[in-house]
């Protein structure tokens, strides 16, 4: 693997939209007992369900630690799922894996962002995180992809959504947080995004979903569904703490044009719940200094927006909630050429995220 001294934009590469053709999806096998209850066993079962759902549409590669490799391999024993051994600190490959970029000549490379476990020692979710910091480079090594490294710049893949046509959406709550890149101004952060995603327009939403422990990742709140169109988590309940967040985001989107000069079409997605972990679920998580404490009184940041687009499919979470059926109908309407597959998302949510957070698509090479 070669680490390049240039940037994707300078070399003619860009991050494609999630609906672009993919060669595979990456996942990481969960096991961390201070994040996943009961030693991670319920979460592992949920990951098997997720991997098999994706594998109906395209290949899946699941990275597992040495101690869990055989267990993962046996549980994921089907032809379209590959299991490889990569040491890791947790399963959030959207944030720890590389952001793949492509050009028009059939090449795929990767951006290796800095990672500090969502805040380092200022509100981060666990320590140490050195194995997660190394994961992107190992994935790129495995795929023989050349690497761009943003030395000294922290970013998680869940904090950005692109349309592949020059626009990225993010949140101020995350990217301007003092625990990510406090040494950089908003303008300097935008410059890094422009250079490494090859975008021209950065759309800043004020906040993400209430109580999102990643500091408001956009992939749990607002996502692109096609160029010029987004899906926004929404509530009409003025007593819901998400109400002000949703309306503030809508104000930005309604008064912003994208890189192509288009006004945004905004589709609304209901927010499930409110959802909470039970005392029993919280008691199953090991208590370790420096790790995120699980508390049944704290609302979970459940969201149907946290879905993954794959080749011909939409893999979305369900929560055994009255809004599940409406969420499915909305996704089916927005993606008429995709099959909507909903899988139980509660166990993933208990760990702090959901389907999009736990997956990373690898785009297919494009030759023009």
UniProtKB/Swiss-Prot annotation:
Pathway: Amine and polyamine biosynthesis; putrescine biosynthesis via agmatine pathway; N-carbamoylputrescine from agmatine: step 1/1. Keywords: Hydrolase, Polyamine biosynthesis. It catalyses: agmatine + H2O = N-carbamoylputrescine + NH4(+). Pfam families: PAD_porph. Mediates the hydrolysis of agmatine into N-carbamoylputrescine in the arginine decarboxylase (ADC) pathway of putrescine biosynthesis, a basic polyamine. Belongs to the agmatine deiminase family. It is an enzyme of class 3 (hydrolase). This is Agmatine deiminase. The active site is at 357 (amidino-cysteine intermediate). The gene is aguA. GO terms for biological process: putrescine biosynthetic process from arginine. One of its GO terms (molecular function) is protein-arginine deiminase activity. It comes from Pseudomonas putida (strain ATCC 700007 / DSM 6899 / JCM 31910 / BCRC 17059 / LMG 24140 / F1). Its EC number is 3.5.3.12.
